[in-house]
């Protein structure tokens, strides 16, 4: 049974983000662009038939609303049926059921707002939508991020964060904390 407000979307690309995580990009048909418009911080629920069982999981959107891309980051977890399916079996060109964006983890951006966030591991995914959105829409805003991971190699979105630090030199600061 299909979830409410769901369309079958084509995976336009799968990017290996770290050894055990991928970023999925979805192709949005022109007639569904409006339904799949999103606010930074929202999430999607993906649904797939895995070994005869319909499994669904929610993942935060990790692309900026201005980017015109709809992407989620998925980290494989031990015994995670859906996350391992996505990381090991899902391919570019495959179709997967995706709900329209939902959720209220969104910022009401104000012209003078400064932000600070602390995240660990794959908890970074909604912020990969929120941070660029804040910096693009608030020319005076500052965003400070404390980001915990096991190792540099296991850090999701490391290169994107480096690009943001270069682009917004005096406005975006990321402090990485490694446990190993």
How should each PLM-predicted stretch be described?
Residues 2-95, 113, 149-151, 162, ...:
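Ferredoxin-reductase
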